């Protein structure tokens, strides 16, 4: 603004001088020549003003050229940066490709390991396939759990879809904002153009008005009009300067907006390129994620199968331990049974020995019984002969003697029977028999002893008795508890003896007496 004001001040001074000079020369020169010279000076000043303005505009042009060079350098720097960014992105892309190849190699190695493990698991599965039917219910429960997991994965998919929808909405918002920005830039440019046109029209109108007023007032008030014209010219120049400044500012703003627009366009292109690259990478990553999820699912299935196999093996180990425990218990039971078997065999041997002894005793008793029957038959024959004849003392003596012999014979048989029983019971008692067997042996002993005592009380004669008069028979009471421990042969012999001693009316029965076959052949 300083160089603009200086020419105006110089113009005012020259105008003052010109007015003074004109006043001095007014008397010498004509008014027409003075007007021509003033017009020349006026136009000369205008030319100087315009030259000054041209110089200023040239300086501004130089400054704009320098700025353009700077902008060009910045543009080249941005291009270099773009190239470096592209190279960096290419390097990162190559690194990612290398990482992907490494991941593929790892995936292949994992697949090989998985195939090996799968073969091993299939072999194990073939070994225990027939046992998996028992855990069908467990597998159904696991399928239910997997269904729950699948529902959770479905929820994850829905969340992913929501995120993709949000991403699309953000993209739409970005496009909308870009459109709004373009409209805003277009409106600014339109406004600047309209402002320029309006200012141009206003300037033209003002110049026309000034020219018309100058023509009107030139004839009447030349000096005032010139002064006013100069003042208006100054004001117009000031307004033009303001307008030019405003235009320069608008141009600068326009250039800045264009630069920002170019930058934004470049950024938009870069973002679109990066978006495309990221979309491709995202697609590749999605494929990799799907592959990895599939592999992870397969690995989880493999781990679940291994867990199932481990559980099955643990169950089998528990079953094996239970079987071992059962086997140990069975072995202990077997040992106990073997010990019991040995005891039973020993007892069977002992019983066999007792049986042989009993058979021997039975044979002896049979002989004794046969002898007793023969003696009883002799007694019966003798008694029948005595009934036919008279009473004979000799017969009575013979009968008593035979009865004594029979009593001795029976008592010897009873002693032979009771002695082995007592010996056998004495042998059995240290071996720890039952209380019932001990009670039976004790009662048998007591019965045999009581029977012997009763038989021993029978005497053949008394002091002072010659046997001429028959004595009153002594009845031996037969008690069941006394006869129960005795054998069948002994009991039959006692019954025969009692019937022989007391022949009340059963002599005919004794005459027809014979041993039954089961008794003779009994073992």
Swiss-Prot record:
Keyword hit for Chloroplast: no
Membrane-spanning ranges: none
PTM sites of type Phosphothreonine: 30
Ligase found in the keyword field: no
GO MF annotation list: microtubule binding
Predominant localisation class: cytoplasm
Coiled-coil annotated spans: 32-191, 248-274, 302-371
Amino acid composition bias (Basic and acidic residues), ranges on this chain: 10-26
Function of the protein: Specifically required during spermatogenesis for flagellum morphogenesis and sperm motility. May be required to suppress the formation of supernumerary axonemes and ensure a correct ultrastructure.
Similarity comment text for this entry: Belongs to the CFAP157 family.
Protein name, UniProt field: Cilia- and flagella-associated protein 157
């Amino acid at each position: 603004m300083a160089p603009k004001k200086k020419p105006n001040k110089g113009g005012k001074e020259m105008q003052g001088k010109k007015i003074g000079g004109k006043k001095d020369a007014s008397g010498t020169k004509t008014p027409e020549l003075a007007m021509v010279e003033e017009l020349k000076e006026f136009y000369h000043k205008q030319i100087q003003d315009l030259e000054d303005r041209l110089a200023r505009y040239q300086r501004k042009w130089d400054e704009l050229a320098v700025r353009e060079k700077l902008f060009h350098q910045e543009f080249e720097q941005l291009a270099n940066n773009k190239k470096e960014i592209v190279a960096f992105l290419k390097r990162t892309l190559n690194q990612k490709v290398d990482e992907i190849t490494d991941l593929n190699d790892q995936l292949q190695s994992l697949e090989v390991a998985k195939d090996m493990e799968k073969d091993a698991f299939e072999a194990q599965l073939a070994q225990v396939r027939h046992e998996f039917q028992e855990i069908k219910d467990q597998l159904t429960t696991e399928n239910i759990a997997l269904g729950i997991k699948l529902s959770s994965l479905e929820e994850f998919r829905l969340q992913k879809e929501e995120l993709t929808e949000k991403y699309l909405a953000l993209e739409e918002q970005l496009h909308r904002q870009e459109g709004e920005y373009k409209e805003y830039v277009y409106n600014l440019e339109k406004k600047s153009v309209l402002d320029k046109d309006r200012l141009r029209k206003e300037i033209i109108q003002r110049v026309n008005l000034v020219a018309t007023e100058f023509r009107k007032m030139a004839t009447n008030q030349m000096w005032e009009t010139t002064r006013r014209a100069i003042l208006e010219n100054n004001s117009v120049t000031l307004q033009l300067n303001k307008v030019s400044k405003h235009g320069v500012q608008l141009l600068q703003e326009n250039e800045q907006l264009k630069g920002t627009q170019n930058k934004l366009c470049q950024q938009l292109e870069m973002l679109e390129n990066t978006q495309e690259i990221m979309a491709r990478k995202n697609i590749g990553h999605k494929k990799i994620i799907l592959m990895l999820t599939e592999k992870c699912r397969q690995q989880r299935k493999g781990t679940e199968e291994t867990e199932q196999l481990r559980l099955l093996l643990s169950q089998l180990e528990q079953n094996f331990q239970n079987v071992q425990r059962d086997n140990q218990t069975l072995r202990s039971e077997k040992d106990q049974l073997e010990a019991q078997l040995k005891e039973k065999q020993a007892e069977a041997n002992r019983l066999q020995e007792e049986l042989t002894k009993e058979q021997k005793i039975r044979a002896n008793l049979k002989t004794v019984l046969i002898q007793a029957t023969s003696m009883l038959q002799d007694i019966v024959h003798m008694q029948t002969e005595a009934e036919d004849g008279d009473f004979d003392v000799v017969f009575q003596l013979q009968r008593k003697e035979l009865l004594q012999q029979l009593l001795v014979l029976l008592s010897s048989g009873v002693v032979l029977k009771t002695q082995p029983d007592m010996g056998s019971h004495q042998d059995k008692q240290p071996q720890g028999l039952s209380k019932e067997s001990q009670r039976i042996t004790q009662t048998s002993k007591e019965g045999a002893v009581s029977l012997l005592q009763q038989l021993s009380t029978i005497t053949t004669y008394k002091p002072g008795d010659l046997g001429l008069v028959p004595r009153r028979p002594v009845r031996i009471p037969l008690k069941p508890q006394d006869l129960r421990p005795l054998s069948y042969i002994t009991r039959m012999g006692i019954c025969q003896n009692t019937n022989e001693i007391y022949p009340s009316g059963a002599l005919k029965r004794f005459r027809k007496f014979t041993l039954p076959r089961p008794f003779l052949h009994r073992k």
